[in-house]
Swiss-Prot record:
Protein name: 4-hydroxy-tetrahydrodipicolinate synthase
One MF term in the entry's GO annotations: 4-hydroxy-tetrahydrodipicolinate synthase activity
CDD domains xref list: DHDPS
Subcellular location: Cytoplasm
Organism: Rhizobium meliloti (strain 1021)
Quaternary structure and partners: Homotetramer; dimer of dimers.
Catalytic activity of the protein: L-aspartate 4-semialdehyde + pyruvate = (2S,4S)-4-hydroxy-2,3,4,5-tetrahydrodipicolinate + H2O + H(+)
Amino acid sequence: MFKGSIPALVTPFTAAGSVDADSFVAHVEWQIKEGSHGLVPVGTTGESPTLSHDEHKKVVELCVEASARRVPVIAGAGSNNTIEAIELAQHAEKAGADAILVVTPYYNKPTQKGLFAHFAAIAESVKLPIVIYNIPGRSVVDMSVETMAALAKAHPTIVGVKDATGRIERVSEQRMACGKAFVQLSGEDATALGFNAHGGVGCISVTANVAPRLCAEFQEATLAGNYAKALELQDKLMPLHKAIFLEPGVCGAKYALNRLGRMSFTVRSPLLSALEPATASAIDAALRHAGLMN
């Protein structure tokens, strides 16, 4: 159910800084039209840390309504507060999301037993499939393969992981520990090719915000075993993967989307709605390299 190119959607804002519902709905529609295989609203790229709870919930509702069951919606529902994560998960279920993406608790650095308890409590509170988001670079805690396997065994609704550890061997380790049916989605665009070769089935992608058709075609090629085609597309996309992350990814993605005429380049503080000139030039060059801009 969850595979292929799944953009971690940006959340457009108006010039005044409020959520731009019309632009968000248009972005969802474009993503589906261009071939994206799923959608993730209110993840890190959706600026969830600086959305209010009401805004967070509204964006999930907008995404579910706009997508109209054409592709699965995996709603962000993470928090370092278990009670808060349960509330967001229950809202996503009520709103009609197909699954939830739950990040490992950040800042408070729980033990592996604490991680197990956190995810178990969420799994017991909703019937939705849960995708673990393991990103030690941001959360400063790394869910071990053993903890992940124990969760998958104890709670069948914990169906997969978005892996942003940067350790490609983890895909094989998790496949052996959690089983072949456990859904593994890359959390890093640049390494998605190798990730899928190790047994992954897709990518929750930042770049797909900007190049949805290319990212969808890339994923389809890898999943079909057509690595010659996948490499050709990887070569087109790699400069964009790299350039977008020269500064915080959402800033790079929104700048690129603005250059393509799709939305304003407005982010919330402490992020800045401006890029260093060298970053902007690199993104422009990458857009041209990918054939997205003249």
